[in-house]
A protein has these predicted regions:
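Hydrophobic structural segments
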Residues: 1-89
Length: 89
């Protein structure tokens, strides 16, 4: 079985969760349009890089998780690898 893979070369903005998720959605839609079964994004795509002190804020990490869950709900028909921070367990 062959799988077509899209590698997203994106430039996310640090701290702009909504904007970065919207950018990811555009890449995902384009990858689906081109018949890809998987799209891979860069490290910390969702929160931007380098997030530095933002990672010390519990609220920011919670917002990242909510944004990631919304993005996952909106994604159908393609596998997505996307970088996002997570709170320690």
């Amino acid at each position: 079985m062959k799988v077509r893979i899209a590698l997203a070369q994106a430039n996310p903005t640090v701290g702009d969760l909504e904007g970065n998720a919207a950018l990811a959605r555009r890449f995902i839609a384009e990858a689906k349009r081109r018949g890809c079964g998987l799209v891979a994004f860069p490290e910390m795509m969702l929160c931007g890089y380098p997030p530095e002190d933002l990672l010390l804020k519990k609220r920011f990490l919670e917002d990242c998780e909510r944004s990631l869950r919304r993005l996952a709900r909106d994604t159908r028909g393609i596998a997505v690898l996307i970088g996002a921070p997570a709170a320690p367990a």
